[in-house]
């Protein structure tokens, strides 16, 4: 699942390119996670537009709607409902140790919301609600899948075998794409000059690579 954006080029290399190769081997679900996106302030109309555009970009990159289930997260209320239940089986300390939370909290100390803190619980719900066996992720998301397994095991220990325990599926190539501006950091939309968007103009792409 990918949050709606202008279409990060690293998302294509790190995820979508690998997803296209998976669609003939597995039963796949691809989700535009617009609920995750609102952990930072969003313009509602713009978020809706970007969500639909992102689905269109998925299809343009080779994901076949006839072979995959493709949808927008907020259109399926069970994601939010299960997230609340799973949150009741998640420890505060587990969430406070999440590397991405610590990184984002350090960068945005004036806007540390409960939504940002519980982001991994909603991600766990995204996975467990579909009884997924494998979760295609980059290396930076492996910790979230491991937390998802821990939550599922804890829930299963109380109520019996309810959830499938997922495994991270990390591609050998493109598991972590680095910033054009800072090769020690992951490429991120928070640094527009350090990343390439799929919808960038050719001259903008060349400018970014020449400055790298």
Residue ranges and their predicted role:
Residues 28-41:
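Short, conserved active-site loops that position catalytic residues or coordinate cofactors/metal ions
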Residues 38-55, 81-89:
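Glycine-rich loop at the start of a catalytic domain that most often binds anionic cofactors/ligands
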Residues 50-70:
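A glycine-rich helix N-cap at a beta->alpha junction
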Residues 102-212:
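Active-site cores that bind ATP or allylic diphosphates and position pyrophosphate for catalysis
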């Amino acid at each position: 699942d990918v949050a709606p954006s202008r279409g990060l080029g690293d998302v294509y290399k790190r995820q979508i390119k690998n997803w296209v190769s998976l669609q003939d081997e597995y039963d796949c679900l691809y989700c535009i996670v617009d609920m995750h996106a609102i952990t930072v302030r969003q313009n509602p109309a713009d978020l809706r537009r970007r969500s639909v555009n992102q689905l269109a970009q998925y299809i343009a990159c080779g994901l076949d709607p006839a072979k995959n289930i493709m949808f927008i997260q907020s259109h399926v209320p069970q994601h939010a409902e299960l997230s609340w239940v799973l949150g009741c089986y998640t420890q505060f300390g587990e969430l406070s140790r999440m590397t991405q939370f610590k990184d984002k909290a350090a960068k945005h100390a004036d806007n540390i919301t409960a939504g940002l803190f519980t982001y991994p619980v909603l991600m766990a719900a995204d996975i467990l609600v579909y009884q997924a066996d494998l979760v295609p992720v980059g290396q930076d998301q492996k910790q979230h899948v491991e937390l998802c397994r821990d939550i599922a095991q804890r829930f299963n220990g109380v109520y019996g075998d309810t959830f499938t325990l997922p495994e991270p599926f990390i591609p050998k190539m493109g598991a972590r794409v680095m910033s054009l501006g800072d090769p020690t950091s992951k490429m991120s939309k928070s640094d527009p000059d350090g990343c390439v968007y799929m919808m960038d103009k050719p001259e903008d792409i060349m400018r970014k690579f020449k400055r790298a």
